[in-house]
Amino acid sequence: MAPTAQVAKKGSKKAVKAPRPSGGKKRNRKRKESYGIYIYKVLKQVHPDTGISSRAMIIMNSFVNDIFERIAGESSRLAQYNKKSTISSREIQTAVRLILPGELAKHAVSEGTKAVTKYTTSK
């Protein structure tokens, strides 16, 4: 007589899993990529005592994705106009100047330049 279900022995470390009823295949969940942890880190740098709701995080993530796509698209177009196959920091900088308005573009360019300088000196 063969047992139909596995029984865990006393003191065993592994948990016994119930058999899968449908097809027997394990489903792999697709991971959702997000800027959430980075948004949270920046929030804590600027306002350490402030939190963020999950809905606000979704909106911020959508905003970052939108800006990223706009800058990537514009810098791609600029590279094509100049017959270049590589997007450099110069194309990114020009795209930021074209997309973001006035003072916001100046701040973004200065922060971007600072980040590139920090990256190149750390190598």
Swiss-Prot record:
It holds the Pfam family Histone. There is a cross-link at K118 (Glycyl lysine isopeptide (Lys-Gly) (interchain with G-Cter in ubiquitin)). Residues 10-30 have a biased composition (Basic residues). Glycans are attached at S110. InterPro entries: Histone-fold (IPR009072), Histone_H2A/H2B/H3 (IPR007125), Histone_H2B (IPR000558), HISTONE_H2B_site (IPR055333). GO terms for cellular component: nucleosome; nucleus. Monoubiquitination of Lys-118 gives a specific tag for epigenetic transcriptional activation and is also prerequisite for histone H3 'Lys-4' and 'Lys-79' methylation. It is found in: Nucleus; Chromosome. Residues 1-30 are annotated as: Disordered. Keywords: Chromosome, DNA-binding, Glycoprotein, Isopeptide bond, Nucleosome core, Nucleus, Ubl conjugation. PROSITE patterns: HISTONE_H2B. GO terms for molecular function: DNA binding; protein heterodimerization activity; structural constituent of chromatin. The keyword Chloroplast does not apply. Its main location: nucleus. The nucleosome is a histone octamer containing two molecules each of H2A, H2B, H3 and H4 assembled in one H3-H4 heterotetramer and two H2A-H2B heterodimers. The octamer wraps approximately 147 bp of DNA. Core component of nucleosome. Nucleosomes wrap and compact DNA into chromatin, limiting DNA accessibility to the cellular machineries which require DNA as a template. Histones thereby play a central role in transcription regulation, DNA repair, DNA replication and chromosomal stability. DNA accessibility is regulated via a complex set of post-translational modifications of histones, also called histone code, and nucleosome remodeling. Belongs to the histone H2B family. This is Histone H2B.2, embryonic. The lineage of its organism: Eukaryota, Metazoa, Echinodermata, Eleutherozoa, Echinozoa.
